[in-house]
Every structure is written in structure tokens, then in C-alpha cells.
């Protein structure tokens, strides 16, 4: 069974399950409540407390355990409960700037583990990960709207995530990995700036859900003064990000500029209000990367079958 997973620093995403925070609590004894997964004699519970940012996600087992959660959710969504181990093919991705150096190690992180046994919701699972396809983020998201990009001589993809903002230049629909990088300008930096400013000026402790509500125009229950601070900080954040891209000699006022990722959805109003991008285009599906991984894996498999 092919399962596509986006291992974000803020959230883990799959195609058929709601995103969940990239955070775990490990315990030697069974905790009360929560989403608890049992693996190798330990209990793992999902938490809203994110794993601290790490450039290399293979440093410990936490992202593998998050992968087991994602696999179980996808098997459950497909009502896939066969006898014996389920053979799983994973489609995953990395930021374009890290792809060349890390893609082999990231794929091997999931392989050669044999049959992996675990339980979730008291249901036992046995999976055998027998193949992993690893692809560049941003490009994967662009694949989902490929028909609109393949005729463009130049398009810039900007993927605003939790800890990083990744960019990749496309030429006639093909990714140019010589023009890509990951900037530490993800929305978590914005959250921290907003929390500090609101605490200093209004003596209030905002959480990220309240910040999201303000930026998305929903009822946050906060005073107007707080909402103004949030929106002003968000506009400054977007301005700084776009200026950083311009300093890297990336043209934002000609050609297509495609924004993707949860951060782009969150900051759409500020991006559209900026005079630094002539005509931004948004991929609003926050699961665009994970869907792109699946498409790229399937295309790669067809290519192998046809001898390419």
C-alpha cells in the first residue's frame, strides 16, 4: 500500500487524515487518555508541544514513531486490516536545499527494519516498509498544479512552513535545484515575535490558535489592540521574508510566484497586501506536498515499469 507523508516541523500531514502536531511524549507506563501508540514496550502520545527544530530528522526515533501514527491513520482510513504484515511503500520529502545531502539517509531511516509491530487505539498493526521514494518539497506541491506551470518559462515556488520558508525555481515546469534554499523564516518565528510583543505591550499570553484565528479573520475573542499587533507583526514578517528573497536576486514582480504551505494560507492577506509581489498565486491545499509525493512516486514507478 502506498502511503504519502509530509514530515513537517510543525505538523505531520497525510492524504486522508487531519494534520497533527509533530510532537510526542514518551512514557514507560501507559498514560491516561490521548492518542497513545505502543511500540517496543514504550507508550507514545501525541502532544501540541513540537519537537525542537532539527535539520536532520533521522537523529533519533521520534519522527519514525510519528510515521507509525501516520501509517496507522492511513490504514484505518482505508479499512486495510489484512492478516499478516502490510507491505507499505512510503512517499516522503525534504526541503529542496537539504534534498541532495539528505535524501538517501532519510530513505534509509525507514528501511531495513523488518516487520514493525505496534498498537494504536488498542488495534495491533504489523507493517513492512519495503520501499521509500523521497522527493523535494515545494516541487512536489507544484506538481499538483503542473498544468498551469509547464508552459511558464519561469516560476518561483515559495513554501512557508513551520520553521522554514523554502523556495525553488521552476523553468518550463522543471525544478532547478541550483536555485533553491531553505530560510529560517517559518511561521513559528512569527508566532514567537507576536507572543513577545503582545506580552510586553498588553500583558497577555496568546497561544498559536488565537494568533491563527486573528490572521484568518475568525473570532478570536481578543481586544482590537491585540489584533492590531498581530496583523502588524504579520505584515512586517511577510515584508522581511520577501525582502530576503529579493536580496537573493529572485524576481518577484515578473513570472509566476506560487505560494504554498500552511504558512502561506495563514498569511495570504499580508502577502496580497504587499507591493513586492506583482501577482501571487496560492495553492490553498495544505496537503499539496503530500499529494505531490504520491504523484511523483506513481510517475517514477510507471517510468521504471516502462524501462525509463
Question: What are the residue ranges of the model-derived segments?
Answer:
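Nucleotide/phosphate-binding catalytic cleft detector across ATP-hydrolyzing
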Residues: 1-155, 174-189, 209-308
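Ser/Thr-glycine-rich phosphate-binding loops at phosphate-binding pockets of nucleotides
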Residues: 160-166
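PRPP/pyrophosphate-binding module of the type I phosphoribosyltransferase fold
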Residues: 167-172
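A contiguous pocket-lining binding segment that forms or flanks enzyme active sites
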Residues: 197
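Short, basic interhelical loop/turn and adjoining N-cap
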Residues: 202-205
Amino acid at each position: 500500500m502506498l502511503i504519502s507523508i509530509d514530515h513537517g516541523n510543525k505538523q505531520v500531514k497525510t492524504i486522508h487524515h487531519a494534520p497533527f502536531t509533530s510532537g510526542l511524549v514518551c512514557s514507560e507506563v501507559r498514560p491516561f487518555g490521548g492518542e497513545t501508540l505502543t511500540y517496543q514496550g514504550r507508550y507514545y502520545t501525541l502532544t501540541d508541544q513540537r519537537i525542537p527544530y532539527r535539520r536532520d530528522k533521522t537523529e533519533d526515533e521520534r519522527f519514525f514513531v510519528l510515521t507509525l501514527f501516520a501509517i496507522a491513520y492511513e490504514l484505518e482510513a482505508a479499512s486495510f486490516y489484512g492478516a499478516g504484515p502490510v507491505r507499505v511503500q512510503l512517499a516522503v520529502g525534504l526541503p529542496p536545499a537539504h534534498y541532495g545531502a539528505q535524501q538517501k539517509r532519510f530513505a534509509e531511516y525507514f528501511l531495513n527494519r523488518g516487520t514493525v509491530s505496534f498498537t494504536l487505539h488498542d488495534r495491533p498493526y504489523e507493517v513492512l516498509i519495503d520501499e521509500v521514494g523521497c522527493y523535494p518539497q515545494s516541487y512536489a506541491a507544484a506538481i499538483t498544479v503542473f498544468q498551469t506551470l509547464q508552459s511558464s518559462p519561469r516560476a518561483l515556488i515559495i513554501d512557508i512552513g513551520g520553521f522554514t520558508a523554502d523556495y525553488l525555481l521552476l523553468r518550463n515546469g522543471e525544478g532547478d535545484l541550483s536555485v533553491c534554499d531553505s530560510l529560517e523564516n517559518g511561521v513559528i518565528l512569527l508566532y514567537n515575535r507576536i507572543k513577545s510583543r503582545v506580552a510586553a505591550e498588553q500583558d497577555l499570553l496568546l497561544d498559536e490558535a488565537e494568533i491563527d484565528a486573528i490572521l484568518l479573520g475568525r473570532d478570536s475573542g481578543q481586544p482590537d489592540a491585540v489584533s492590531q499587533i498581530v496583523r502588524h507583526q504579520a505584515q512586517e514578517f511577510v515584508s522581511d521574508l520577501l525582502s530576503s528573497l529579493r536580496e537573493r536576486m529572485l524576481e518577484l514582480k515578473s513570472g509566476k510566484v506560487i505560494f504554498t504551505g500552511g504558512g502561506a494560507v495563514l498569511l495570504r492577506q499580508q502577502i496580497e497586501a504587499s507591493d513586492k509581489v506583482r501577482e501571487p498565486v496560492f495553492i490553498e491545499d495544505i496537503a499539496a506536498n503530500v499529494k505531490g509525493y504520491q504523484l511523483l512516486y506513481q510517475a517514477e514507478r510507471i517510468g521504471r515499469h516502462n524501462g525509463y
